[in-house]
Structures are given as structure tokens and as C-alpha cells.
């Protein structure tokens, strides 16, 4: 009888592990390699960005403003990560909203990129957007547990108000479509160029759970995520967010990473990271 009880307990524990697991998710606008950045140019800070990503070793990292040479450098110097995504245009050094993932831990079952425009399947922009904007997404499977998760990453336009409103609508509709295809947890990362109180963000906050405001433990460090490379000024706005599906995820921890070096920041945005339980 005692042996049977132990077997039952072990089975329950194994089943609990199998059907729920935690992932660490990071969103990080690394700032493109602009010649106008002076002492904050990519060539000066790239080691700091690389070291930060390597140290925190999130399961998934949604990058914004990443250009191909930057992506190549980060991958060449961190063998733990795989990469997926495509640039928003065919121009040289066009920006990616790509996803890094721990390649020895996850398998990519499906991936794609779509545009935040009236024709999402075709490169271009719509409404009042200054630039074409994209969403890269993938369905990942944990190689050991077989647990699956959709991960989406985006970067909203910084000018177009209508474009940002429509972008939120398009993403929510896409998430519904993905969940109909495979009803598993969903995570959305991005630089939304918006604050929580902006009207177009309301549908995202209502239909998904935002990581900072829903964290079980008290969020760590700053709320603001945009620092503008201004080390001596207190950041005031959170425009980078991590969201997850309400019915099958639980946010356990959230942190804004305010690491710095020589009184400078690795990027003009603080990376954010959340520990999320997948149910």
C-alpha cells in the first residue's frame, strides 16, 4: 500500500511538471547602430548588450531595432541562442523585430512575419505610420517536456496614432487565429511606443495580462523603460511591455534591468524580463 501511495505521489508530481513549466522572457530594444549616437554608438556598447543577454539567459528574447550586423554579432558571440525573423523592408540594414531562443531547449514548429498594415502579408505601411512595422512570431516546443508556446515580438510606429491603434487590433486578431490553430500559451513582447494610458493600448491590457501589473511578486526596479541614453535624468515612461494569455499563464516575477557601465546604459531602452508559468 505504501509503495502504491509513493507511486501515486510521484505520478502527480511528474504530471504537474509536465503540464506546467516556467519560462523567462525578455524584451529589449537594443537601439540600431546609428552614427549619430557618439559615445553610445553600437561599436562601443555592443559588448555590454551581448553580456547582458548572455547573463540573463532568457528562454526567449524579443529584440527591436536590431539590424543584421548587430544580430550577427550577438549570435556569433553567444552560441546558446538561435534566431528567427526577417527585416521589415528589403533595404540595407533594415530593422528586425526578431526572436532569440535557447536552441538546445526549444524546437521551432512554425514561424512567420507579418506587417502591421492593411495588407499584413505584404511589405509596406498604412494609415499614418512613418515606417513599415512588423510582428515576428513562432510556435516553440520544449524539447524535453513537449510544452508549446506561441511567442510574438513587435515594434509599434512612433508617429502614427491610427497606425498604433490598428496595430493593436491586428495583433489581437492574429493571436485569436493562432490560438484556434493551437490553443497553447501566448507571449507578446515589444516596444509599443505607447504608455499604458494610451487608448489604443486598452484592448491589449483587457485581452491579455501585462507582466508588470500582474506579477505575483513585487516588480523589481524602475517602471520606466525608455532612458534615451540620459544617465543623469530619471526615466519617466514605460513603453516596452510583455504580455501573456490570461487563461493559461501566470506571471511570477518581473524586472526592469537598469544595468549600466561607466555611467552609460547599454541601450536607450531598459530591457525587461518576466518569469512566466505556462499552464
What are these model-predicted stretches?
Residues 27-47, 116-130, 157, 228, ...:
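Acidic/histidine-rich helix-loop elements
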Residues 5-17:
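Sec-dependent N-terminal signal peptides
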Residues 61-64, 85-86, 187-191, 210-213:
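Active-site neighborhood of phospho(di)ester-bond hydrolases with catalytic His/Asp-centered motifs
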Residues 22-34, 109-114, 147-156:
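Active-site-proximal beta-strand elements of phosphoester/diester hydrolases
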Residues 2, 18-77, 88-95, 169, ...:
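N-terminal, active-site-proximal structural segment of metallo-dependent hydrolase catalytic domains
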Residues 105, 162, 166, 176-186, ...:
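Metal-dependent phosphoester-hydrolase catalytic domains
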Residues 31, 67, 155-157, 192-195, ...:
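Catalytic metal-binding/acid-base residues of hydrolase active sites
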Residues 60-152, 255-256:
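Structured beta-strand-rich core segments of catalytic domains in phosphoester-bond hydrolases
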Amino acid at each position: 500500500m505504501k509503495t502504491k501511495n509513493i507511486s501515486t505521489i510521484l505520478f502527480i508530481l511528474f504530471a504537474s511538471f509536465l503540464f506546467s513549466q516556467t519560462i523567462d522572457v525578455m524584451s529589449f530594444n537594443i537601439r540600431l547602430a546609428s552614427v549619430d549616437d557618439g559615445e553610445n554608438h553600437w561599436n562601443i556598447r555592443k559588448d555590454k548588450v551581448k553580456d547582458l543577454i548572455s547573463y540573463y539567459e532568457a528562454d526567449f528574447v524579443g529584440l527591436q531595432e536590431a539590424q543584421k550586423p548587430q544580430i550577427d554579432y550577438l549570435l556569433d558571440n553567444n552560441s546558446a541562442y538561435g534566431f528567427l525573423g526577417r527585416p521589415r523592408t528589403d533595404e540595407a540594414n533594415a530593422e528586425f523585430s526578431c526572436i532569440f531562443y535557447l536552441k538546445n531547449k526549444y524546437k521551432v514548429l512554425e514561424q512567420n512575419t507579418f506587417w502591421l498594415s492593411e495588407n499584413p502579408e505584404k511589405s509596406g505601411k498604412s494609415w499614418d505610420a512613418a515606417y513599415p512595422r512588423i510582428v515576428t512570431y513562432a510556435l516553440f516546443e520544449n524539447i524535453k517536456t513537449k510544452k508549446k508556446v506561441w511567442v510574438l515580438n513587435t515594434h509599434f510606429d512612433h508617429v502614427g496614432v491610427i497606425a498604433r491603434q490598428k496595430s493593436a487590433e491586428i495583433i489581437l486578431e492574429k493571436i485569436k487565429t493562432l490560438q484556434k490553430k493551437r490553443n497553447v500559451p501566448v507571449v507578446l513582447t515589444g516596444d509599443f511606443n505607447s504608455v499604458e494610458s494610451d487608448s489604443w493600448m486598452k484592448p491589449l491590457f483587457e485581452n491579455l495580462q501585462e507582466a508588470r501589473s500582474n506579477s505575483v511578486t513585487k516588480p523589481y526596479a524602475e517602471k520606466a523603460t525608455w532612458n534615451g541614453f540620459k544617465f543623469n535624468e530619471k526615466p519617466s515612461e514605460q513603453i516596452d511591455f510583455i504580455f501573456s494569455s490570461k487563461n493559461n499563464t501566470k506571471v511570477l516575477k518581473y524586472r526592469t534591468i537598469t544595468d549600466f557601465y561607466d555611467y552609460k546604459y547599454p541601450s536607450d531602452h531598459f530591457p525587461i524580463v518576466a518569469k512566466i508559468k505556462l499552464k
